[in-house]
Swiss-Prot record:
One of its GO terms (biological process) is ribosomal small subunit assembly. GTP binds at residues 15-22, 62-66, 123-126. This is GTPase Era. The gene is era. It comes from Nitrosomonas europaea (strain ATCC 19718 / CIP 103999 / KCTC 2705 / NBRC 14298). HAMAP family: GTPase_Era.
Length: 296
């Protein structure tokens, strides 16, 4: 498929919630495929993002934030996704926040494989109030684990991302490319549409509701340069449904409009999007329901 000398490998991006894993993936591949918000638990599935340059193909696996605070079946499924992702890859990227390393980070550290190269990414260096804190923090991290490289970055500002790519490239095996050079993800448009809508719910609604929300795409058809999408937002209680719909349907309309614009940008076509809200009590603790919603 490719001439000798090419490198291709899988890279798992792991860390506690809200360290910027999805933002890092989106900026590495220069396209938004993994949803982001300031709330924990935004990413729930493994997302594959693909970066191909002249020499190598990097297949990134963005994972949910590993955490033990919430014990629902959904959270247990997501933690299993994280652990499994570190067994099926060539390199692990462990993301922490500059100047901050707490118990949640330690819990992820304890799960890191000893038989694979682990690159430490210190993200959000732009938010450090005192830049002189960076070197001591890097030394502190070097003392807790034998990382193959430590790379400070600002994913949001695209700083040091090329250095991170080179640190990862050193550990990729010699393999032909697995995906076409213009592919950026192996996830379907149907899946990405659901994720983009769920992101809008996470960003616009208060603290509690998003954790009880899932999105199901009930219809996805392509008609020339038009994608016709019917989506359903699932919640657990009637009062959550009312919150998402908002007064005279305004919140739901705003979320749908923003999601549609993101879909049009990602798919490169016009999108007709219809969204409604349904109550499905207890779905986050129902194994059968979780499987039907695509949770692994």
């Amino acid at each position: 498929m490719n001439a000798p000398g090419y490198k291709t490998g899988y890279i798992s991006i792991v860390g506690r919630p809200n360290v910027g894993k999805s933002t890092l993936l989106n900026h590495l591949i220069k396209q938004k495929i993994s949803i982001t918000s300031r709330k924990a638990q935004t990413t729930r599935h493994r997302i594959h993002g693909i970066l191909t340059d002249a020499q190598s193909q990097f297949i990134f696996v963005d994972t949910p934030g590993f955490q033990t605070r919430h014990r629902s079946q959904l959270n247990q499924v997501m933690n299993r996704v994280v652990l499994q992702s570190m067994q099926d890859v060539d390199v692990v990227v462990f993301v922490v926040e500059a100047g901050r390393f707490g118990r949640e980070d330690e819990q992820v550290l304890e799960q890191l494989p000893r038989n694979l190269p682990v690159v430490l990414v210190i993200n959000k260096i732009d938010l450090l109030p005192d830049k002189l804190q960076l070197l001591p923090f890097m030394q502190k991290m070097a003392d807790v684990f034998e990382f193959s490289a430590i790379v400070p970055v600002s994913a949001l500002q695209n700083r040091q991302l090329s250095a991170l790519i080179e640190a990862i490239r050193q550990h990729l095996p010699g393999n032909p490319f697995l995906f076409a050079e213009d592919e950026i993800t192996d996830r379907s448009e149907r899946f990405l549409a659901a994720e983009l809508l769920r992101e809008k719910v996470f960003r616009q609604i208060g603290e509690e509701v998003p954790y009880s929300v899932s999105v199901v795409i009930e219809q996805f058809t392509v008609e020339g340069n038009l994608r016709r999408i019917h989506a359903c937002i699932l919640v657990e209680r009637e009062n959550q449904k009312a919150i998402i719909i908002g007064k005279q349907g305004k919140k739901l309309k705003d979320m749908a409009t923003q999601a549609r614009k993101d879909m049009e940008m990602l798919f490169g076509s016009k999108v007709y999007l219809e969204v409604w809200v349904k109550v499905k009590s207890g779905w986050a603790d129902d194994i059968t329901a979780l499987k039907s919603l695509g949770y692994e």
